[in-house]
Amino acid sequence: MRSTLGPKGLDKLLVDDEGRTLVTNDGVTVLETAKVEHPVAKMLISTSSTQDRVARDGTTTTVVLSAEMLRNAWQLVRQGVHPATIARGFALAEDFALSCLEDLAINATQKQVLSAIETSLAGKLDQAMEAHLSLLA
């Protein structure tokens, strides 16, 4: 998943059971195509699907950040930290991050906005359609 992240993200070649192929760098597509059994993997796929449904973007970032948080939480559990303490820590971190957003916000130039739109559309549509839609913004 990490390798699909960002404007220089790499495409993935997906092959289903019937040999059909799909090339994509869309995180939710990669995940929803995967066959997984592990409950945590299923939870991450569900999180990605929710992100896609709500924002239509950010699925890979959501999964990469969530997976890293889970990895760190597991290390804390292995060190003897109670899961409830970890959950409280995540809640405090969320509150702190949300309180900082206003101070971190910047005014973007038209060029930066266009670049962000193009990045968001990359790999989701035909390239000509991506260029056309990004100019409409």
Regions found by a protein language model. Give the residues of each.
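N-terminal glycine-/lysine-enriched basic segments
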Residues: M1-L136
